[in-house]
Amino acid sequence: MNKWGVGLTFLLAATSVMAKDIQLLNVSYDPTRELYEQYNKAFSAHWKQQTGDNVVIRQSHGGSGKQATSVINGIEADVVTLALAYDVDAIAERGRIDKEWIKRLPDNSAPYTSTIVFLVRKGNPKQIHDWNDLIKPGVSVITPNPKSSGGARWNYLAAWGYALHHNNNDQAKAQDFVRALYKNVEVLDSGARGSTNTFVERGIGDVLIAWENEALLAANELGKDKFEIVTPSESILAEPTVSVVDKVVEKKGTKEVAEAYLKYLYSPEGQEIAAKNYYRPRDAEVAKKYENAFPKLKLFTIDEEFGGWTKAQKEHFANGGTFDQISKR
């Protein structure tokens, strides 16, 4: 072997030795399985190309509130990708995430958005067109439990906001409306994917209140001949949020790759993957490319209608809040 061949052999051997094997844990909310299965492959390839290191990302899924509790209780998540900011704040309150986490990434650390829509059976036999149809007698509604599910809290607040707008912002009338809606709920699963399975696989209910991405997944990939999506006249802008878990990445030495993992969600490839998985992308060019995939509707925000997540959580979902009040039979 000539000297160039020997040198190349040593170089390749040195590169092989220097390449690291890294493992991350992404603790996410219920219906993001398909999104992150695709995204993880793309990021791993990107990181390998950039650094030569091998990164494997493990996933954990469940109701967003339950997932936040698991991180608070010690599960060593490098990153969390949860349904709403309050759940990340809850982890930050326990000192595992920096309290200024929401400022670390663009768009308040929400790299994609969604909203809340209805999934009905083919032909829409109960003629469900808007939120007011969900309180009619004989309509069986499926939605998760707001005590454990982030999506369920978005569902609840979307209904509440609609009721406010149609009752001159009368909170008492909004509470009566939401109480009537939940009287029609047949099954309260712990997470959004569980509710989808109840509706789609078990055949229970006339209408599923769902994340838009979950409804599109069910309709487009599980049975266009079985289901239809109904987009209400208005709904809430749902903003799932992401953060590095500071205490864990500092302990494991994974901060650099964990931060890069979340930042890459904002890249053109990350945004494209989000859009293909039925999430509304933030990137203007990607959003324009997929604009026909997402119906236009009036969207209100958690800050506009409810004064932010801390206030909404306290008033509606804490012990003794409005959800507990309307749940009393």
UniProtKB/Swiss-Prot annotation:
Cross-referenced InterPro entries: Sulphate/thiosulphate-bd_CS (IPR000957), Sulphate/thiosulphate_BS (IPR034408), Thiosulph/SO4-bd (IPR005669)
Domain of life: Bacteria
Keyword Secreted: no
An MF annotation (GO) of this entry: molecular carrier activity
SUPFAM superfamilies: Periplasmic binding protein-like II (SSF53850)
Signals that turn on the gene: Repressed by sulfate or cysteine.
Family annotation (Gene3D superfamilies): Periplasmic binding protein-like II
NCBIfam families to which the protein is assigned, alphabetical: 3a0106s03, PRK10752.1, PRK10852.1
Function, in words: This protein specifically binds sulfate and is involved in its transmembrane transport.
Record-given protein name: Sulfate-binding protein
